[in-house]
Regions:
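Periplasmic/extracellular loop-to-transmembrane helix junction in inner-membrane transport proteins
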Residues: 2-13, 17, 39-83, 103-104, ...
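Transmembrane-helix boundary motif in ABC transporter permease subunits
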Residues: 7, 82-114, 283-292
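N-terminal signal-anchor/first transmembrane alpha helix
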Residues: 9-35
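Generic hydrophobic transmembrane alpha-helix motif, especially the helices
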Residues: 115-161
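Glycine/proline-centered hinge or cleavage motifs at structural transition points of membrane proteins
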Residues: 121, 187-188, 201
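Interhelical loop and adjacent transmembrane-helix boundary motif
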Residues: 139, 225-273
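Transmembrane alpha-helices
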Residues: 168-169, 173, 191-227
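C-terminal transmembrane helix and the adjacent membrane-cytosol boundary/short C-terminal tail
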Residues: 170-174, 178, 185, 255-310
Length: 310
């Protein structure tokens, strides 16, 4: 009996050690990446100055090198914002359709097809954009006759983030108690009113989480963007202009640049890292603030109920 107890005790300690090691590995990996980026990128930014680093001219290999990333930063924000606008618009309405307005026998096939998009490699999306979207924009939409640019990149990224928006939004709405929807109908609301005025506000925290994930996916995407964005490091002034994003710039120069140009790419990575960190931190603060407000409302209701009983 003692031997069995001893074996179980040893196994529990081994499993606890394994779980702790996995958790520590994640922390160490994040800390290592953070230290590498900051130790390599911040000295370069301090060396050339914020004014030059956030300038508009990027020419790291010229006789008079310049390391300005402002045009690529603006292009990244434009592409990300437009792609999220497209993806959230289509994805949210798709989730709403699957939630209450789609025949039950169609829900599973449509959701499986949407989820299948998440398993397609980025390069396939890039090929689709390069052979279908870019020629279509060039021939039928662009006034300048250029298909590469912000709009084509945003359309490709909008398609890529659809599975995230649809899945997270649908799960968030399904997590809301069905009594909310039934109660709204009982009070005279239509299905559309109950969905948009009751269910969506109740699920907004989960939907916002999906939007944050989509933004992270969009701003970090590289391969598909390289194939359709045009890759000209110019300040964007039009949706149909060839531009270059931060991730595309890093990927294009990572294997060729050494010395200061390579340090400039690492410094660009610092900007991306800080942007992602700020995005996640902002979402966490918003979510915590909402949780605190909900807790305060719940306490007020309980106090009101007690006062009414007394």
């Amino acid at each position: 009996m003692k031997s069995i107890y001893g074996f179980v005790h040893v196994r529990e300690k081994l499993m606890r050690g394994l779980f702790l090691a996995c958790a520590l590995f994640s922390v160490v990996a994040l800390a290592t990446i953070t230290v590498f980026l900051l130790a390599s990128g911040l000295p370069f930014i301090a060396e050339i100055g914020l004014g030059e680093f956030f300038g508009t001219r990027w020419a790291p290999l010229s006789d008079t090198p310049a390391y300005g990333i402002l045009s690529m930063l603006v292009a990244s924000l434009y592409v990300t914002a437009l792609s999220v606008l497209i993806g959230v618009g289509i994805g949210l309405f798709t989730a709403i359709c699957l939630y209450k307005f789609c025949p039950r026998w169609l829900v599973s096939p449509i959701r499986q097809m949407v989820n299948l998009l998440s398993g397609i490699p980025s390069v396939i999306f890039g090929l689709f954009g390069m052979t279908v979207i870019v020629p279509f924009i060039r021939d039928y939409i662009s006034p300048s006759g250029v298909g590469y640019g912000i709009l084509s990149s945003a359309l490709v990224l909008g398609i890529m983030i659809l599975p995230t928006i649809v899945s997270v939004s649908l799960d968030a709405m399904q997590a809301v108690p069905g009594s909310y929807f039934e109660g709204a109908l009982a009070l005279g609301s239509t299905r559309e009113q109950a969905t948009f005025r009751v269910m969506l506000p109740a699920a907004k925290s989960g939907i916002l989480a999906g939007v944050v994930l989509a933004v992270g996916r969009a701003i970090g995407e590289t391969m598909a963007v390289i194939m359709v964005v045009g890759n000209s490091p110019e300040m964007p002034v039009s949706l149909f202009q060839s531009v270059r994003t931060l991730t595309a710039n890093i990927a294009l120069g990572a294997t060729e640049m050494k010395g200061d140009p390579e340090r400039a790419l690492i410094a660009t990575g610092v900007v991306l890292f800080v942007f992602t960190l700020l995005l996640n931190t902002s979402f966490s603060l918003l979510k915590r603030d909402k949780t605190e407000k909900d807790d305060r409302k719940s306490r007020r209701k309980k106090e009101s109920a007690k006062e009414a009983q007394s």
